[in-house]
Structures are given as C-alpha cells and as structure tokens.
UniProtKB/Swiss-Prot annotation:
InterPro entries: eL8/uL1-like, Ribosomal_eL30-like_sf, Ribosomal_eL8/eL30/eS12/Gad45, Ribosomal_eL8/Nhp2, Ribosomal_eL8_arc. Belongs to the eukaryotic ribosomal protein eL8 family. It comes from the Archaea. Part of the 50S ribosomal subunit. Probably part of the RNase P complex. The gene is rpl7ae. Multifunctional RNA-binding protein that recognizes the K-turn motif in ribosomal RNA, the RNA component of RNase P, box H/ACA, box C/D and box C'/D' sRNAs. Gene3D superfamilies: 3.30.1330.30. It is found in: Cytoplasm. Pfam families: Ribosomal_L7Ae. This is Large ribosomal subunit protein eL8. One of its GO terms (molecular function) is structural constituent of ribosome. Keywords: Cytoplasm, Ribonucleoprotein, Ribosomal protein, RNA-binding, rRNA-binding, tRNA processing. SUPFAM superfamilies: L30e-like.
Length: 117
C-alpha cells in the first residue's frame, strides 16, 4: 500500500465514489489544483488514485485535508479516476467543488468517515 493511503476502501465504495464523481457539477483535477481547492476550503470531497508514482506528488493531500476537515477517499488507478470525471487521460487527484446530488455526496462522506473509524 502506498504511503499516502491511510485506509482501505472496498471495491463497492470505489464504484459509488466514481458514480458521485461522474455526476458532479464542478471538479478540480490534478494534484496542484486539488491542493489549491483544499487550501481555499472549496473542496467538498477529495479523491486520490492509489497508484500515483512518485508518491510524493499526492502524499501531502491527505494531511492538508485532515487539517481543513475535508473528507477524502481513494480509487484504484489514475485511469479509473480520469474516466470517472469524463477525461480521456488519467489524473492523480480530483476535488468535487460543486455537486448535483448533495444527498449522494453526504451519504458517501458518511460511509468514508465510517471507514476511518
């Protein structure tokens, strides 16, 4: 497991995360954009790929998410993360800025918080 992966995410949770991402209204993609969104407090949920190399690219993101109280989770690969938001290329990190279905996001965040406990 990568250094920055703080908890294990079941497959069905990854699928639910991808579904919520695909229905999001506005997202920021890439480690730099996600870092800025977290620091500004505009991110509602951060999703990181588990296969980022070198790991240092995203290793700081879970730490600043915890400092800012922003929930975060993981998806297996950068390719899966890119596909979930409609990109033809892979991405290491995504932050949801605006969502269409607030209830689905809230439900997902509660499940993520349950994994950390």
């Amino acid at each position: 497991m990568a250094v920055y992966v703080k908890f294990d995410v079941p497959q069905e949770m990854e699928e639910k995360t991808a579904e919520v991402l695909s229905k999001s209204e506005k997202v920021k993609k890439g480690a730099n954009e996600v870092t800025k969104a977290v620091e500004r407090g505009t991110a509602k949920l951060v999703v990181l790929a588990k296969d980022v190399q070198p790991e240092e690219i995203v290793a700081h993101i879970p730490i600043i998410c915890e400092e800012k109280g922003i929930p975060y989770t993981y998806i297996a690969t950068k390719e899966d993360l890119g596909k979930a938001i409609g990109l033809e290329v892979s991405t290491a990190a995504v932050a949801i800025i605006a969502e269409k279905d607030a209830n689905a996001l809230k439900d997902l965040v509660e499940k993520i918080n349950g994994l950390k406990a």
